[in-house]
Design a protein with these regions (language model features):
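Short internal beta-strands
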Residues: 13-17
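Catalytic core segments in nucleotide and nucleic-acid processing enzymes
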Residues: 10-12, 50
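Donor nucleotide-activated moiety binding/catalytic core segment of transferases
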Residues: 19-71, 76
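A short helix->loop->beta-strand "cap" motif at the edges of active sites that frequently abuts
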Residues: 9-10, 78
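Catalytic binding pocket for nucleotide-activated donors in carbohydrate/polymer assembly enzymes
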Residues: 68-142
Length: 164
């Protein structure tokens, strides 16, 4: 909610793995705030197959936890920020996976807010161009990927680092 208030010109669509929590009385006040907000809604249509992919493909920015769809979006050059904190934890998975040199991990709300504002000011093409090195480091992004050679190069690099 705070992010949507800070970015009134952006439209936020929240998509969850499961939505059964929407019927829990504890969340009633938060849900009421979301309903009142003009630039935020919860995607609750689970009858259509692959709606998450449709939402991602039409988004200016994807904010997600560490998920496979987040990786898929990054591999296509979509602007992604990784929400890697909760009420009492931060850096839950980024201590293992950091995606450097990509600056996409958010360990607290201030980082999420700052990075969101920055990304919303640029185009997807600009995001992709500015992050080409990091995107190419983690994903097979050539038009005709030679998967076998790419994997072999990565394995060789790992062996060199391990001095094996």
């Amino acid at each position: 909610l705070n992010l949507s208030k800070q970015n009134p010109d952006a439209y936020f669509i929240l998509r969850y793995k499961k939505i059964n929590w929407l019927h829990i009385n504890f969340f009633k006040d938060i849900l009421l705030e979301i309903k009142k907000a003009k630039n935020i809604k919860i995607s609750n249509d689970y009858s259509k197959y692959n709606i998450s992919y449709h939402l991602c493909s039409s988004s200016d920015l994807i904010i997600a936890k560490f998920t496979s769809i987040m990786d898929e979006c990054l591999s296509l050059g979509f602007p992604v920020l990784v929400h890697d904190y909760s009420y009492n934890l931060n850096k839950t998975l980024s201590s293992c996976i950091d995606y450097k040199p990509l600056d996409i991990i958010c360990s607290n709300f201030d980082e999420l807010s700052d990075k969101t504002k920055k990304i919303l000011q640029i185009s997807q093409d600009q995001f992709e161009n500015e992050n080409k090195e990091g995107l190419n480091k983690y994903f097979l992004r050539t038009k005709k990927p030679d998967v076998k050679n790419k994997i072999q190069l990565i394995v060789n690099e790992v062996y060199k680092e391990l001095n094996v």
